[in-house]
UniProtKB/Swiss-Prot annotation:
Similarity field: Belongs to the AP2/ERF transcription factor family. ERF subfamily.
Tissue occurrence: Mostly expressed in roots, stems and anthers, and, to a lower extent, in leaves, seeds and silks.
Protein's name in the database: Ethylene-responsive transcription factor WIN1
Keyword terms: Abscisic acid signaling pathway, Activator, DNA-binding, Ethylene signaling pathway, Nucleus, Stress response, Transcription, Transcription regulation
Subcellular location: Nucleus
Bias (Low complexity): 159-174
UniProt lineage: Eukaryota, Viridiplantae, Streptophyta, Embryophyta, Tracheophyta
Broad class of the protein's primary localization: nucleus
GO BP: any one term: cuticle development
Species in which this protein is naturally found: Zea mays (Maize)
Record note on disruption phenotype: Reduced amounts of C24/C32 fatty acids, C32/C34 aldehydes, C32/C34 1-alcohols and C31 alkanes in leaves leading to decreased epicuticular wax level and increased cuticle permeability, thus conferring a reduced drought tolerance.
Protein role: Promotes cuticle formation by inducing the expression of enzymes involved in wax biosynthesis, particularly promoting very-long-chain waxes formation. Confers drought resistance. Acts as a transcriptional activator binding directly to promoter regions of CER2, CER3.2 and KCS1, wax biosynthesis-related genes. Binds to the GCC-box pathogenesis-related promoter element. May be involved in the regulation of gene expression by stress factors and by components of stress signal transduction pathways.
Keyword DNA-binding belongs to the record: yes
PROSITE patterns: AP2_ERF
Length: 213
């Protein structure tokens, strides 16, 4: 009878995202990095709620306003997401952690897990509505956003693609500012795609550039 009551107590607690219970009763929290596709260990906690709040903190640090959390996200005066941590949160890597200390600890664990973190996810993309092709980037972090790094307009005359790429490279970065490694790679990706899609000799027909992503 006692064993049945004990097993029921183990099943009753609400299930939280990124939280699981050990056989001896403690709760552990871990989160999967959205870009690196690997799990980050967040620690062991006394209650499921504390573990869930630690998960929420890590989710906001990695995904910002797009984070999927267990509890509602509070907004600061600047509009940034700030999930509140439990008052009595204690883990195996810090005892009596405050909200600020918990955020610092989680940030340190994420940096340690990702020794060479990838700040963004970059890929070639075609935008048929605006008739251009370019490099699209999604950043990770507390201020996660997505934007076009650079674009090349799809002209009807395939012979003008070289001029379009040159004008685009001239407008993407100021002349006085050296091109960083990320922009250089992005521009190289576009130039290679344009050169592989251009015909051997220009013609005045109705052919238009076709790009396959």
């Amino acid at each position: 009878m006692t064993e049945n009551l004990h097993s029921r107590k183990m099943v009753q607690p609400k299930k939280f995202r990124g939280v699981r219970q050990r056989h001896w009763g403690s709760w552990v929290s871990e989160i999967r990095h959205p870009l690196l596709k690997r799990r980050v260990w967040l620690g062991t906690f006394e209650t499921a709620e504390e573990a869930a709040r630690a998960y929420d903190e890590a989710a906001v640090l990695m995904s910002g306003r797009n984070a999927k959390t267990n509890f509602p996200i509070q907004r600061s005066s600047t509009g940034e997401p700030t999930p509140a941590a439990g008052r009595d949160a204690r883990s195996n890597f810090s005892s009596g952690s405050s909200t600020t200390n918990l955020s610092q600890i989680l940030s340190a664990k994420l940096r340690k897990c990702c020794k060479a973190p990838s700040p963004s996810l970059t890929c070639l993309r075609l935008d048929p509505e605006k008739s251009h092709i370019g490099v699209w980037q999604k950043r990770a972090g507390a201020r996660a956003d997505s934007n076009w790094v650079m674009t090349v307009e799809l002209n009807k005359d395939a012979a003008s693609t070289d001029a379009a790429s040159q004008s685009t490279s001239a407008t993407t970065a100021p002349p006085a500012t050296p091109m960083d490694e990320e922009e250089r790679i992005a521009l190289q990706m576009i130039e290679e795609l344009l050169s592989s899609s251009s015909p051997a000799s220009p013609s005045n027909g109705d052919d238009q550039g076709r790009f396959i992503i």
